[in-house]
A protein has these predicted regions:
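Acidic (Asp/Glu-rich) sequence patches and key acidic residues
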Residues: 1-138
Length: 138
């Protein structure tokens, strides 16, 4: 079964009684690192949950994702330095180094995408037309 992390913006409602409209702006598959980091840190609602089908992405929640990514990038860079140190005496580490460099690059790309989502959340303070940014898992 495939599932997706969906990111939505919610335009401001004209009245309190008006139903929220969720506009899909991005979706990430289960094998995406964004999906994994959001699932671990934000715990998005599942679309089948009738009472709470969406989770609001707050500044604190997105910061938790960024902090977790930064921690993983930092520890991976530390591990890379260790591998590079041992590679001089043992060429078996070369493949590990190549894979770890790719992993770090992927994490940095993911961090950039999450920072873009953070910018959307920050923009809700400036754009009166946007009520919130939220997510769920379909």
């Amino acid at each position: 079964m495939s599932s997706y992390l969906s990111i939505y913006i919610v335009p401001k409602r004209k009245s309190e009684g008006e139903e929220k409209k969720h506009i899909l702006v991005a979706a990430f598959s289960r094998n995406s690192e964004i999906y994994q980091y959001f699932n671990e840190n934000i715990h998005p609602a599942y679309n089948g949950n009738k009472e709470h089908p969406y989770t609001t992405i707050t500044k604190d929640r997105i910061q938790d994702v960024i902090t977790d990514l930064s921690r993983d990038i930092s520890s991976s860079k530390d591990r890379l330095m260790e591998y590079e140190k041992y590679a001089k005496d043992n060429p078996d580490y070369i493949q590990e180094i190549i894979e770890l460099k790719q992993y770090i690059s992927d994490l940095q790309y993911t961090q950039g995408e999450v920072c873009f989502i953070e910018d959307m959340i920050d923009s809700t303070d400036f754009y009166e037309e946007i009520e919130e940014v939220c997510c769920n898992i379909d």
